[in-house]
Structure formats: C-alpha cells, structure tokens
Amino acid sequence: MRCFSCLNTQTNDMRINIDTLSDLTDYASVATKIDPRGTGSKSGILVNGKVNSPKPGGGARSFTFKELAAATKNFREGNIIGKGGFGSVYKGRLDSGQVVAIKQLNPDGHQGNQEFIVEVCMLSVFHHPNLVTLIGYCTSGAQRLLVYEYMPMGSLEDHLFDLEPDQTPLSWYTRMKIAVGAARGIEYLHCKISPSVIYRDLKSANILLDKEFSVKLSDFGLAKVGPVGNRTHVSTRVMGTYGYCAPEYAMSGRLTIKSDIYSFGVVLLELISGRKAIDLSKPNGEQYLVAWARPYLKDPKKFGLLVDPLLRGKFSKRCLNYAISITEMCLNDEANHRPKIGDVVVAFEYIASQSKSYEDRRTARKSTDSNRLRRETKQSY
C-alpha cells in the first residue's frame, strides 16, 4: 500500500490508500490496468509515452503547521494574496529563503479532503512548464495546506478586470501569449497523459502568471480522469465555476475533454473583450458573457464590438478575426464540433507570433516617427 506517511487515521488526520481512491486518485488503479494507447504498460501512468508510477507526495515536501505559520508570520492578514470559497492564499518565505504561495483550506469551504488529495496526487505525478509546481503540503489535525511556487503577477483576472487607475492593460500580444500558455497546459493534460485528464476548472482566476506573463495552470482539486476504452464520456456531479461550464456538462453531468475546450473558449472571450464570464453589475442582456457575445461571434462585421476598449485598436485586425473565429468554435454548443486542443495550440501559436510581429513593426514605426520629429524640431532651431 502506498500512502502519505504523515497521515494517520488515529487522529484527525487522513491515511490514504491511493489504490482505492475515487476521482483523479483513481488514476493509480486505472492506469495500472488500462493502457488505451496500446503500449501494453501495466505498471503506471503514461506521461509523454513513458510510464510514471503514481507516488503521492513524491516530489513534494511534508511541512509542519509550525513551519508554515512561521513562513506567513502566523498567517498575517497582510500576507493574503488571494481568497475564495476554498480558503485563503498567503505569500510566505520558507527557512531556505524561497518565496512561496501557501493555500490554507477552509474546513467548511468548497475544497474538501478529497479535492486536497487529488491536487497533491496530480501535481506529484504530472510536471509541465504550464502547470504550477507543488512544493509541499501540510496535514496537521484538521489543517490542510498546499505550498506552491510563488507567481509574482498573480492571476489573469487581476490583469483583465477592475483595473486600478495606474494599472497598464494587457497588450493584445500578451493576451495571445497567455492563450498559448493555457492551451499548452490543457494539451498536456489531454494529449500527453494516458488516460487523459479533464481539468474541469479552467477559468481566469486559475491561470497564474510570472513576471514574463508566462502561464501556470493551478487548482487541480476538481480534475477528473477522462473516459477510457469505448466510453464516450464520464458521468459525474457537476462541479466547477458557473459561467465556464460547458452546456452538456452543466445540464446532464456528461463530462469529456471537450468540456475543457468550452471553458477555454470562455477564457478566450474574456481575453478578447476584457469582460468577466458573469458580471451582475452589467445591464440585463450583458451579464452573461457568452450569451452577450453570441450575436457578434456569428457576424465578422461585428467582431470589433467584442474587443476590449482598453486595447485602443492596437492589434492586427487579421489576428483578431482568427482569434474570434477559433473562440466561436470552442464555444460550440455541440461538444463534438469543438476543436481538438492540439489544433487550438497550433492556431494560437501562429496568432501570437503574428501579433508579436505586428507589435514590433508598430514599435519600430513609432520610434522612427519620434526620431524624425526630433530631427525636424532640432533643424527648426
């Protein structure tokens, strides 16, 4: 039996046999029995064509509650960098000097023991440049804490919505770069792992950013193993965030990897429009982003009405048209008609590269015009 050695059923702690867990932790048992890609492996999870044996907490360190209290100055309110139904996230500094983000789960919150276990299992097995790195965890009494690498720029929603007066809006290129990073993270879960993993909680709040605006997907407590063998979907209780859930999943609990594609389409719409998936402060008819955008998505002549005014027209119209066309495909009500994530990655890599070229040309033109104006001003004297 493989288990978290720090967890003990004789106290308030948990002891976990990963071979009998449900949800994503079923990966341990499912992956040892099934290899739908035909390699014949029976000893673990296929990641990038190689077998990974699930070892919960494998690369993650077990922290004491005292260590994490010291790192956050006793969970001082001034150290809080995020809050939600799950609890609070604190900025902390470990004894080694490493700056980290520490998520303290609320015992009465939305994220319970099961989701905690799923997240530790998942981030201990799966590693990718676009997935957040789990440094460690703590299970002391009723306390459940997760320790992640610190992302200095916060989440995507911090840079799209309710900006401070002195805050610079994201450029078009940066938005497309973020779309590429998020898509690559999803591609890893869908295509590089066997069986596939359905993220189930893709939203702007879970897209973290470093100083270069490179993406790290976070919060995997709701992740689910995708359908295997001849199964077309997974039937499960509806979880996730309202406004991002695919219609077939929200209505019937039928979950597939295409459910993530729909959620990605909502994020794309947020990137393009600068609007929230749900914003009850908007007038009636504009509160639900997808419903508001539908008429514009179907008419290329109205694409411009979707664009965030803060972009001030500083983007290639051709790149905008491409991005909106793909967004519309991702938001198709019919799951089977949504694109594969691999195709989405290729498309947005192209859009991002073209957007960068456009931005570079625009900057060069601006510099040339500025130099010419300076020369003309000097000559006039």
UniProtKB/Swiss-Prot annotation:
Q: Where is the active site?
A: 201
Q: Where is this chain primarily localised?
A: membrane
Residues noted as binding ATP in the record, renumbered to the chain: 81-89, 103
Matching SUPFAM superfamilies: Protein kinase-like (PK-like)
Q: List the disulfide bonds.
A: none
Q: Where is the Protein kinase domain?
A: 75-351
| Lipid-acceptor residues (S-palmitoyl cysteine) | 3
Q: Name one GO biological process term.
A: defense response
Q: From the UniProt annotation, give the residues forming the signal peptide.
A: none
Q: Where is this region: Disordered?
A: 361-381
In its record, the post-translational modification comment is: Palmitoylation at Cys-3 and Cys-6 are required for plasma membrane location.
EC number(s) per UniProt? 2.7.11.1
Instruction: Point out residues bearing the modification Phosphotyrosine.
Output: 148, 249
**Which GO molecular function annotation, any one, does this entry have?**
ATP binding
Please provide an example of a Pfam family that matches this protein in its UniProt record. Pkinase
| InterPro entries xrefs | Kinase-like_dom_sf, Prot_kinase_dom, Protein_kinase_ATP_BS, Ser/Thr_kinase_AS
Q: What keywords are annotated for this sequence in UniProt? A: ATP-binding, Cell membrane, Kinase, Lipoprotein, Membrane, Nucleotide-binding, Palmitate, Phosphoprotein, Plant defense, Serine/threonine-protein kinase, Transferase
Residues modified as Phosphoserine are 235
Q: Spell out the PANTHER family in the cross-references.
A: OS07G0668900 PROTEIN (PTHR47985), SERINE_THREONINE-PROTEIN KINASE PBL22-RELATED (PTHR47985:SF45)
Family from the record: Belongs to the protein kinase superfamily. Ser/Thr protein kinase family.
Function description = May be involved in plant defense signaling.
Q: What is this protein called?
A: Probable serine/threonine-protein kinase PBL22
Organism annotation: Arabidopsis thaliana
